[in-house]
């Protein structure tokens, strides 16, 4: 049986922040904190003694006292349970205004509670760090075991395939593999709907702790093992039902099914990768395109255009290039001008990272131009270049900005369109003829898009009038280097206050009376001065109203602005007359009041 002193000592040692209750000489219990010998201040009145130093909280005037905790009955643990009511009262009174001697004791209790909370927070952080390190070590060890097991399984499968290629039979169909993989991918997407398909595991939208990372990694390993067990179980059931042979309990697959599985794995891997990494790994081939020499392209440099091999939902007016690998021709001839191909040139500039670029060498003398086209078609490629260049539905890829300003008023891509007439396009002498099949831009183009283009290219009548007044050209599409630009500084203030104008009193030279008012600055001009900027007459059109009693409504009313010069003497004479009239009115109003008094 443990004595009360031993229990008290254990409670003091287990106290958070080394907090204790100390009984003072007047009999009151005060919160304190045990110190280490190094923490004892040098200016303490009492020298070092045998025992443990304890400092009272909230009392700077009291020195450090030494107590023997094993035998002392004047020291108790802070959470011994006897003074919980005092702690609750101190918490409740911390938000209220207090006055008196009890405030010092309550402040000391609140100070002890702060120290306790700080130590608890530090201990929680240390526990989290330790648990996170242990989870990460476990995950790393699990990954190493899984990698070693998968490598051993691959080696055994390769040996079996090399030794007996004739006895290989497919035990797991590709459709079941697809179903299992698709169901697993859908379940993962349901768990994390914020993760995008292109980013994969890198596009996590929230911050996570070390514990969450360790749990997710361990959960991913368990799920992967469950998938492998499920696939093996399905293969065993199929082989038993179909009568396929199984050697030593291992599943045996055919070469065709293995190829399908490899291709499916590569596709899934590409889906999880970023678009930029996938485009960097895709092969590029140069396709020479010859244009007619009669068409003059008045270009001044190299223009960039973009081609994407993936479907774009946002691009409603794009063009796709489908390459058919069936012949050995190397040239494509384009002569006719095909309009409305560049439909989303400005909207697709922000997506340069998602689509691969096409380099166009546009020179005035040369007629051969090279286009770098990414190969995203079938796996089997024939020698040479693709046979047919087919421009199909405009939702597969983006071909934008091939020519920005070809000629003075042309924004078109020149393509030979003779497939509708049944004739083939011409090609260079060394290459065979190539059929260029052009399907038109979507017929169901909405009317509001066309109307928006017309409205953007036109200019309102008010803008034309204003530009004519100030001598500017009314050409909205001109972007020549001769256009002038003006820098206008605009200041926006939150609270605008008008400047205070003082009242000024002057003596009139005519009447000798005082004139009180605000000062006004007047600029004296020459006699022959005239303002050259006169606004044009504004024509106001009245709305058509129903005719009543045979009266005809006027449709136009002309209003002209007139600028006139008034002599300065006339202005001041008018001001004097107004001031005299106001003075007389004040005198008349003052007379009745004086009579009443």
Swiss-Prot record:
Ranges of biased composition (kind: Polar residues): 166-185
Source organism, top-level taxon: Eukaryota
Compositionally biased tracts (Acidic residues): 144-161
Listed Gene3D superfamilies: 2.30.30.140
Alphabetical list of InterPro entries matching this protein: PWWP2-like, PWWP_dom
Bias (Basic residues) ranges: 450-460
Domain PWWP: 16-78
Compositional bias per record (Basic and acidic residues), positions renumbered to this chain: 134-143, 461-470
Disordered: annotated segments: 126-210, 449-482
PANTHER family membership: PWWP DOMAIN-CONTAINING PROTEIN, T17B22.17 PROTEIN-RELATED
Protein name (record): Uncharacterized protein At1g51745
Organism (species): Arabidopsis thaliana (Mouse-ear cress)
Top-level taxonomy: Eukaryota, Viridiplantae, Streptophyta, Embryophyta, Tracheophyta
